[in-house]
Amino acid sequence: MEFSFNSKANTEFDFKLVLVSSDHLTLAQKDYESIAIPGRSDNLIVDLGLTKNKTITDTCYLVSDNLYLACKEIRNWLMSPIGYQTLSYEDGSSFNAIVKGDIKVKVIFDTAAEITIQYEANEVI
């Protein structure tokens, strides 16, 4: 599966970066307020008309002759832009997203690694 972040696709590198799993289709939580009112058996629910940001986790496989340089390039691609950027997937879904926390790299072989990326995102409607 292909994806792009900040208008650059995962297929535009000199190394191979393949998205193997993503939870981007998980629905965001509705934003509401629950207010306890004395004498009432249940809470008053106020719908704020919004959805909360969600966390998207993508797992990719990286294949490169030099994992260190490839990881630096991935970091620069995902973490250099300041603020929210467009994250889109080949199924047509699109989000305003920012990388949340570390980009986790787990080396599998000398030339292969598993990359885990977490984004804080809200859906573009």
Sequence positions of predicted segments:
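Extracellular/virion structural assembly segments
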Residues: 1-125
